[in-house]
Swiss-Prot record:
The keyword Membrane does not apply. Its main location: secreted. It is found in: Secreted. Residues 1-21 form the signal peptide. Residues 226-345 are annotated as: Disordered. GO terms for cellular component: extracellular region. It comes from Aspergillus fumigatus (strain ATCC MYA-4609 / CBS 101355 / FGSC A1100 / Af293) (Neosartorya fumigata). Residues 254-345 have a biased composition (Low complexity). This is AA11 family lytic polysaccharide monooxygenase B. It is an enzyme of class 1 (oxidoreductase).
Amino acid sequence: MMFSKSGLVAVAMLGASAVEAHMKMRQPTPYSDSSLNNSPLAADGSDFPCKLRDNAFVPPSQETIAQIGEVMPLTFTGSATHGGGSCQVSLTTDLKPSKDSKWMVIKSIEGGCPANVDGNMSGGADVPDPFEFNYTIPAGIEPGKYTLAWTWFNRIGNREMYMNCAPITVTAGSSKRDAAPVAEKVEVEKRSANFPAMFVANINGCTTKEGVDIRFPDPGDVVEYDGNPSNLQPAGEAACSGTPAWTVSGGSGSPSTPSTSSSTPAGTSAGVSVSVGATVGATPTAEPESSSSEPAESEGAPGVFAPTSATVFPSTPTASAAPTSSSSGAGSESDSSSSSNGALTGPCSTEGLWNCIDGSSFQRCANGQWTTAQQMAAGTECTVGQNAQFTISATAVKPRMINAMRHRKRAHGGHRHA
């Protein structure tokens, strides 16, 4: 759901619900989930990392298993989304992390995380966040046991840092990818073996600016833009002000000794995608209100989910969801060049503009450049042309296809009982 309200109303919404519900990671399942509350880290950093407390690292009954290159779900519970913000996904080899732990960022989401809304959503602390995200364990990470951290810097409200942690077991990639030519594997690993350190602020003397989706000083290779471009912090502006009393280490790449040894060499999946620059990611799977319609399951482009009817995602919240004419944005990107399949490359001038290519793939103008085209999810199509609003419609999916997708999902659900 996109909220189109004035800033005053957004702040009022924030104040009304922030007391009763913040946000909490749902997938992957966190450590000590029963004792994990949805509040931010302490302002003095005393519970960093992972909201330290008694018995903070009790593993869940279901262990999260992630194959290198596999797209994994990143989902949340709660409604106090504080106008969204920016998030990172990081890994450490420490199974009981401390302030001395080394964190490796594998994905940064700048804007729209954990939801692309003006203020807060309704529903309370136990309502699933309809905006779903994902992450992929990249090449350069060795198989073994890790702690995954989700960190969030909210756009509206008190200057806070949220952090939830979950145990995760990384397994080697598919044999098909492992059999790729040596030169190809070396190039992928070269691009993805250097992971920056986790960004820390609002608990260490360096404070983020309110009202903007921060840009991380070192976001890494995989960066996703899910918010409204007008909210994104200007390029070159510092992510926080003040001198940090402390930071965390990280960034050198795959550790030589993961938390548990494995005789299987590291591999990469056929689905691995090292994205240098902007990508377009999460979209809501449904309206925040409950619906009796079940979205079609998909294995398409990461973060794009199949709605059961036409759905519109505006670049900037508007009171109306009516799509603009497909010609409204056409011709405005005169400096761009077009490939044989209709995808645009090079600079673009209308920040946030969507380009639907043949209904089966799409791209977006982000940071003045056209992103790489991504395939639509199975069972969906977009309205062809350049638009300020992105319209997704469900296509007919045969029952046999749906059953096959459900079978694959059950077979690769990403969990096993510990």
